[in-house]
Amino acid sequence: TNISHDLRTPLTAIYGYLNLLKKEECPEHIKRYLDAIENRAQALKQLTEELFRYTIVISEAEEMTLQVLTLNGILESSISAYYSVLKQNHIVPEISIPDQQITGRVNENALSRVLGNILSNAVKYSDGDLKIVLSEDGEIRISNHASGLSEVQAERLFDRFYTVNTARKSTGLGLSIAKALMEKMGGTITADYRENVLEICVSVQKL
């Protein structure tokens, strides 16, 4: 958190000087340079903010407590939280959740965050479909067609700061946070990409 704080101060100064320069009468090519500098400063600002959030999440995870909880309800709540986003993107998820109660040793807030990050990623890269399955052995599989991905990109989805498309306003921390949280809970998260379908599998700690 100290690093991200130390980066914020000079960034604020850069923005201040940029705003002053943009108010001056400048040749057109200088204006283009200033716009380019502002864009890169904005990207660095976002990276700093996400780094700050990442360090907060990871530090909180150090004191994480695990409980035996029902996965059905946690998954249903996570899907409900993304209902408006899915609807806005014209995605109607295919959901399969057993009637029987599936339990696992997890931290509810952490697992909710993991699922939220996966769903957010799915919305970004989905071709319009989404399949969510909770199996009886406690695995949660979230899959969708993602023709914009490659196998190499899929393998790097959990890398910190890696983003598939640099044009997207994201530094790629969402899934790396999900991986860190799953490891803290003694579970796993994996990605499999075959025939243009990306599947994220979350496996919680068994009882």
Regions found by a protein language model. Name each.
Residues T65-S80:
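A conserved beta-strand-to-alpha-helix junction within the catalytic ATP-binding
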Residues N39-L44:
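Short alpha-helical segment of the dimerization/phosphotransfer core of two-component systems
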Residues Q67, V92-I102, D137:
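Conserved catalytic submotifs in the C-terminal HATPase_c
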Residues A122-V123:
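Short helix-loop "hinge" at the ATP-lid/N-box region of the Bergerat-fold HATPase_c
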Residues S59-M64, T103-V106:
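Conserved micro-motifs of the catalytic ATP-binding
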Residues L149-F161:
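Short conserved segment of the HATPase_c
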